[in-house]
């Protein structure tokens, strides 16, 4: 029996302004395998909110229009996956060279990017109409593909979507977007596509998460020192892929995976001048930790009050860790925090 599991995390959007510009034979179009607020999506919502709330970032409220936005795009990616017999995930719904049924001709097309999909002008025949007026928005996508020659294999959707969410939390930029404290509402969609190629049966799972702050709510700046993980949280233990790569072109995460990152958000009016951290397991240091700040971030996504500590090596599964970090702000003020967390089996 041959089995293969692959995961992919696509580039995540951070906060976005509501004023920004947004600018052969095919297989049958797939029918979405789950509906909004299905058991699987509710499990993902529960896990997301438990982690946000426990670490002080606040829980999110489900929004039906965001659910529809997420469902449209998840269905688009599922359609492209099935038509081309290869896993596909992207933040954009544009024509892709070498792929069939991409762009505006796809029956689930709803907009070139997330900003357009929140208020779609052009819809494919199977896409649904939706509208969401936002101040800030973000998008996280996770893809998991399982290949096997076992025709009786079935996917445990709930376990799969939870593992996909843990993978997102283990990715520095995706983690940052998932816990963004100004987001108050969320929409999710999970799709499963089954297809066969080269005598292998593939099960492609797609998770689309759209988070936002509606225009009707006041934007409240963060005034706390927050971090994820935090006391009592269970996380992933390694990361083998993220786009964009937090190391730029200097490291291939597939061959040099990293451990669960530590994301720290200082109050909005603070600028982090120095940041140090130690991570130990039963008193023994785990080794090198990379420090990502607004100055060292190769993708220029972090703000002046953010830092991400990244273990150089994967952590151990089902293991407890102790974290201690210190920040020095540009006004000379120092702050520290300590907490423990555990990795999942």
For the regions a language model picked out, list residue spans one by one:
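Functional surface patches built around histidine and acidic residues
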Residues: 15-281, 302, 306, 322-325
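Surface-exposed, short loops/turns at beta-strand junctions within beta-sandwich domains
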Residues: 312-319
């Amino acid at each position: 029996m041959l089995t293969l599991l692959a995961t992919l995390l696509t580039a995540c959007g951070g906060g976005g302004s509501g004023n920004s510009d947004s600018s052969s034979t095919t297989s049958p179009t797939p029918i979405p395998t789950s509906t909004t607020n299905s058991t699987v999506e509710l499990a993902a919502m529960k896990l997301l909110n438990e982690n946000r709330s426990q670490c002080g970032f606040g829980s999110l409220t489900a929004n039906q229009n965001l659910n529809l936005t997420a469902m449209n795009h998840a269905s688009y990616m599922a359609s492209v996956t099935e038509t081309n017999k290869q896993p596909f995930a992207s933040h954009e719904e544009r024509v892709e060279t070498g792929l069939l049924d991409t762009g505006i001709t796809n029956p689930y097309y709803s907009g070139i990017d997330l900003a357009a999909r929140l208020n779609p002008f052009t819809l494919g025949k199977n896409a649904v109409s939706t509208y969401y007026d936002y101040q800030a928005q973000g998008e996280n996508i996770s893809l998991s593909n399982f290949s096997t020659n076992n025709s009786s294999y079935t996917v445990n959707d709930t376990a799969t979507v939870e593992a996909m969410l843990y993978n997102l939390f283990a990715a520095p930029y995706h983690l940052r977007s998932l816990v963004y404290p100004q987001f108050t509402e969320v929409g999710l969609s999970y799709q499963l596509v089954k297809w066969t190629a080269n005598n292998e049966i593939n099960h492609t799972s797609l998770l689309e998460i759209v988070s936002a702050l509606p225009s009707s709510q006041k934007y409240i700046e963060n005034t706390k020192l927050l971090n994820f993980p935090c006391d009592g949280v269970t996380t992933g233990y390694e990361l083998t892929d993220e786009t964009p790569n937090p190391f730029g072109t200097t490291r291939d995460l597939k061959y040099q995976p990293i451990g669960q990152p530590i994301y720290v958000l200082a109050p909005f009016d603070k600028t982090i001048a120095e940041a140090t951290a130690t991570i130990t397991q039963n008193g023994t240091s785990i080794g090198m930790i990379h420090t990502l700040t607004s100055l060292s971030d190769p993708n220029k996504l972090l703000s002046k009050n953010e830092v991400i500590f990244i273990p150089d090596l994967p952590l151990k599964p089902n293991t407890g860790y102790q974290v201690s970090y210190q920040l020095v702000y540009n006004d000379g003020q120092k702050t520290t925090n300590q907490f423990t967390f555990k990795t999942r089996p």
